[in-house]
């Protein structure tokens, strides 16, 4: 008898538990968001799967392409849902234009973070900081000092030295008739430049520091999709005490912390004469300034370096790789670039950053590569307040996803959008019309747009411009096969080449005796 009672009690307990769990799941995941009950028209929503909604689309390998298919079928402004979490998907230049023009402040936050205490896009990060006092302070510091004109001038020699080193390395490969993986070479270049510009040092190859840093950046980028999902579901899961992917995220964050703590200690031990010019000095001065508008912490400094390495390296590396790939597939473009460089720079010295303003065609080629292959194809933001877009109502706290990849191939604003035509950027800059330039900026989104747009675009153009300029000026290039395979892949959230670009450099005549 006792056994029967205890059996019934067990069943009853399990039943109550299942009931409670079902109720909680319904409440947190399937209940419609509050605002959708208001009598406003939400944007159209394409068919979705029961319970999970459109989550399968976001988890697909080439998310920007899956979303492109969806928008070409159902329209440029869509209402998607991940369980019951709403997302607004924007896929045309005109809707993106309307949003950036009318809602810039309203969309100047990226939503909650995946894990607050993480150095990787946690609450100390500049990239994920909400639009508020900390972000405003860091933005000012970034634009005026860290990446400002004076800082760029002071760090010019660092970049020139590393471009020369890159060139010598290619010369060595050319002599040995060896091929190079462009992405790997560009990654070394970017890592060296960023380490020296930000910390005044390079990491040592011998004790494996460089490898460790590279590995951490790759690991973080690999985590981006998981982090995006964790961010989307955070408000719901938090109520259940669940923090999605916390272990993975904190694992990388802790490794960054160890590496950066060592950098801070070693920097403090440097003689005073070697301090004062790099980004770390500027950040330490702000940290020690009692009267600063915002009091930053050591964690803010570490998180800023993590932002910098994740935000600046792979994006620039992929731009170098895609640009070279397009040049290899369009030999007439290579010839025109060479003519321009040879006439402006000549054949007796290496191209320099100061030549770049006189090389508009080189600039146009890089812009065209960024248009067709934006390293960050999807731009995530969050609507802070409810608003109206395209006649539809957007509820507050809705995630915004702008498919920059599709906006930059929108046939309504780009002529022959699928073709690689750098000239399109020459025509518009020559017209010099301020309005046209502004409109151009709003449909050309590789660096995002508005106040949360990329503050590193000028630096990126300088590094990518010098690297591509040097490769075109100094070498002929051989590819395996007829054409470069332009198939896409996505690493984390970064758009990359499915088949990494491998080329063999051949020294151009006359020999580069001046390197
Ligand atoms: C070709 C290279 C690069 C590309 C394609 C790129 C692209 C982007 C994009 C798409 C965003 C988001 C913009 C938005 O939401 O509107 C961004 C943000 C950012 N980028 Fe870049 N970036 C590049 C290079 C750099 C460099 C060299 C740096 C710094 C040295 C940098 C630092 C940042 C920072 C700090 C943010 C966050 C800004 C904020 O949230 O206010 N990026 N970048």
From Swiss-Prot:
SUPFAM superfamilies: Cytochrome P450
Knockout or disruption consequences: No visible phenotype under normal growth conditions, but mutant plants exhibit loss of tropic response to gravity when reoriented relative to the gravity vector in the cold.
Binding residues for heme: 454
MF annotations from Gene Ontology: heme binding; iron ion binding; monooxygenase activity; oxidoreductase activity, acting on paired donors, with incorporation or reduction of molecular oxygen
UniProt-listed Pfam families: p450 (PF00067)
Enzymatic class: oxidoreductase
Gene3D superfamilies per UniProt: Cytochrome P450 (1.10.630.10)
Transmembrane portions of the chain: 9-29
PROSITE patterns in the record: CYTOCHROME_P450
InterPro entries recorded: Cyt_P450, Cyt_P450_CS, Cyt_P450_E_grp-I, Cyt_P450_sf, Plant_metabolite_P450s
Membrane topology per record: Single-pass membrane protein
Similarity annotation: Belongs to the cytochrome P450 family.
Name used for this protein in its record: Cytochrome P450 705A22
Source organism of the structure: Arabidopsis thaliana (Mouse-ear cress)
């Amino acid at each position: 008898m006792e056994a029967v009672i205890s059996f019934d009690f067990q069943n009853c307990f399990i039943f109550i538990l299942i009931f409670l769990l079902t109720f909680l799941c319904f409440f947190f995941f399937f209940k419609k968001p509050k605002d959708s009950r208001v009598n406003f028209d939400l944007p159209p929503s394409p068919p979705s799967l029961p319970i999970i909604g459109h989550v399968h689309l976001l988890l697909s390998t080439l998310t920007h392409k899956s979303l492109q298919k969806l928008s070409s079928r159902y329209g440029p402004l869509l209402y998607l849902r991940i369980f019951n979490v709403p997302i607004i998907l924007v896929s045309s230049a005109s809707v993106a234009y309307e949003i950036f023009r009318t809602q810039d402040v309203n969309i100047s936050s990226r939503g909650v973070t995946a894990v607050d205490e993480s150095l990787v896009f946690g609450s100390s990060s500049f990239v994920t900081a909400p639009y508020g006092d900390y972000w405003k302070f860091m933005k000012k510091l970034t634009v005026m000092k860290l990446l400002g004109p004076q800082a760029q001038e002071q760090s010019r020699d660092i970049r020139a030295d590393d471009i020369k080193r890159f060139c010598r390395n290619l010369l060595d490969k050319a002599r040995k008739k060896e091929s190079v993986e462009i992405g790997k070479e560009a990654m070394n270049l970017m890592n060296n430049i960023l380490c020296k510009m930000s910390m005044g040092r390079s990491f040592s190859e011998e004790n494996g520091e460089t490898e460790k840093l590279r590995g951490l950046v790759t690991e973080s980028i690999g985590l981006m999709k998981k982090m995006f999902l964790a961010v989307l579901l955070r408000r719901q899961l938090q109520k259940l005490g669940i923090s999605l992917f916390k272990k993975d995220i904190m694992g990388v964050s802790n490794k960054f912390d160890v590496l950066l703590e060592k950098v801070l200690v070693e920097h403090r031990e440097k003689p005073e004469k070697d301090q004062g010019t790099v980004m770390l000095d500027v950040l330490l001065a702000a940290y020690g300034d009692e009267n600063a508008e915002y009091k930053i912490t050591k964690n803010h400094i570490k998180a800023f370096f993590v932002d910098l390495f994740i935000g600046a390296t792979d994006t620039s590396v992929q731009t170098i790789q895609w640009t070279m790939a397009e040049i290899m597939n369009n030999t007439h473009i290579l010839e025109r670039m060479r003519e321009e460089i040879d006439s402006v720079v000549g054949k007796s010295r290496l191209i320099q950053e100061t030549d770049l303003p006189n090389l508009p065609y080189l600039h146009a080629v890089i812009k065209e590569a960024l248009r067709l292959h934006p390293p960050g194809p999807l731009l995530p933001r969050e609507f802070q307040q409810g608003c109206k877009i395209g006649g539809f109502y957007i509820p507050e706290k809705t995630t915004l996803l702008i498919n920059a990849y599709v906006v930059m191939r929108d046939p309504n604003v780009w002529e022959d959008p699928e073709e690689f035509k750098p000239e399109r950027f020459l025509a518009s800059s020559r017209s010099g019309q301020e309005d046209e330039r502004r409109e151009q900026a709003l449909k050309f989104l590789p660096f995002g747009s508005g106040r949360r747009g990329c503050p590193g675009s000028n630096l990126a153009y300088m590094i990518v411009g010098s690297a591509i300029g040097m490769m075109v000026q100094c070498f002929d290039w051989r590819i395996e096969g007829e054409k470069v395979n332009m198939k896409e892949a996505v690493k984390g959230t970064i758009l990359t080449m499915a088949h990494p670009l491998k080329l063999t450099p051949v020294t151009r005549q006359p020999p580069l005796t001046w390197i």
